[in-house]
Amino acid sequence: MLQIKQDLLDALGQALKTMAPDSGVAAVFESPKVAAHGDFASTAAMQLAKPLKLNPRQVAENLRGLLLQAPAFARWVDAIEIAGPGFLNIRLKPEAKQQVVREVLQGADQYGMQLADSPHRMVVEFVSANPTGPLHVGHGRQAALGDAICNLFDTQGWDVWREFYYNDAGVQIQTLATSTQARAKGLKPGDAGWPEPAYNGDYIADIANDFLAKKTVKSDDREFTASGDVEDIDAIRQFAVAYLRHEQDLDLRAFSVRFDNYYLESSLYSSGRVDSAVQKLKDAGKTYEQDGALWLKSTDYGDDKDRVMKKGDGSYTYFVPDVAYHLAKWERGFSKAINIQGMDHHGTIARVRAGLQAASAGIPQGYPDYVLHTMVRVVRHGEEVKISKRAGSYVTLRDLIEWTSADAVRFFLLSRKPDTEYVFDIDLALAKNNENPVYYVQYAHARICSILGTWAAQGGDASQLKSVDLSALDGPQAQALMLLLAKYPDMLSNAAAGLAPHDVAFYLRELAACYHSYYDAERILVDDEAIKLARLALVAATAQVLHNGLKVLGVSAPHKM
């Protein structure tokens, strides 16, 4: 059906050129807000009315006449109706919609994907938690968002690089070290001599005990053996960071999130990248000194005020390593960069982009892109859950996975726009009913697999479904299901362009609902062989698209439930 839609759009474009060669009106189809109005809709007639100085409905009549003469419309379109002030509502013939079943079954896991001969390179930075404690549910939302956005761009033919940026050079790391040292010396929160500020969770005691036991910890890219010397604060710091990096690796593994690279903030200093970035800005004439500090002329690039880069004591402000880091992204060949961060990072966007523009490195405006998300509240039995014994002051990602499942956490956290607050209801995530969105979608897939399994047990061969006669798929529920399957590729493309994985979750819920309606309307395993095979082909195609969409979200598509 993809080619059919393109042929119809080409015919519409040619008709628009015939009527108004210089109008600039694009050939675009929209989805009617009411399904009964048709399968595609066009507002082109209303857009042409002004340049043609004609009534929109008259333009629609003229445009309709041209379209009816086009071979593609004659072959695939059942009717073109004019509605309201000049809408063109297009109804497809059943055989046009039936084409999508073959496209899905032939494309299989590749259905909806765009292939590129020479894909552009992009980097998506997400999670990027300080190695100072277990990952909390906010990090979980970021992990789900980042991984799904990477998966979306994978489907669009991009060469996607997944990166975790470790903030291992800030004051929080020193707080981690002093907290661990205090635990190693036998102190507890509230004792005389307990440091302030400090991390108070039970995990600090675990780190201290392993440090005293001289254990070795290994994260994905390095390992460190404890010395056991409670006076060696640097050794304690290195061990604590390695320990928590390992713990975070375990959290992410439980969430099925992988990274291609772990980039250390400290490496920006040790490699000289921070000093180099500052020198670039100086050489470009985009800095000045005032009150003993070095300032960036960030107002030249849309920031609301100039920003201090280097304080009087010689230390850099926190956005300077961010500028250096993003210069490094560009220099590594990433033409597109996306950062998934909490809403509290909103204030850094303008100054980081200003620094990149001021560096005169050829970086386009708006680099990098940002997806900002709000935090997550967790409720159980109607009461908010705030405390985790392990973390001390927040619910961890691992808590949530253990209480529910990785699938539920993923789907739930992706089922709302990132900038809307989300309340994670543990009871709902555990429910086995239609109110639970992930259960509802997964059950649709499992239900189809059960039908196909029953047929296979009777001697059915799934490979023959790619070529069966589909003319029996002419009922309204079947037509609606096929039209929705046909929307999957455009939905994926639009979701990637809009950095909107929630659109995939919305689509899957709609597809599951459409399938359940079809299942209730028509028996699949009927006696008539031709009808049975056609219906089996349709439900097999539906299962394939459910599987593909769930894979984008990082959620499993079970065969049994």
UniProtKB/Swiss-Prot annotation:
One Pfam family, short name: tRNA-synt_1d
Superkingdom as given in the UniProt entry: Bacteria
Location, primary (coarse class): cytoplasm
EC number: 6.1.1.19
GO cellular component, one term: cytoplasm
Database matches in CDD domains: Anticodon_Ia_Arg, ArgRS_core
SUPFAM superfamilies per record: Anticodon-binding domain of a subclass of class I aminoacyl-tRNA synthetases, Arginyl-tRNA synthetase (ArgRS), N-terminal 'additional' domain, Nucleotidylyl transferase
Top enzyme class: ligase
Quaternary assembly: Monomer.
Record-linked PANTHER family: ARGININE--TRNA LIGASE, CYTOPLASMIC, ARGINYL-TRNA SYNTHETASE
Stated family: Belongs to the class-I aminoacyl-tRNA synthetase family.
Annotated protein name in UniProt: Arginine--tRNA ligase
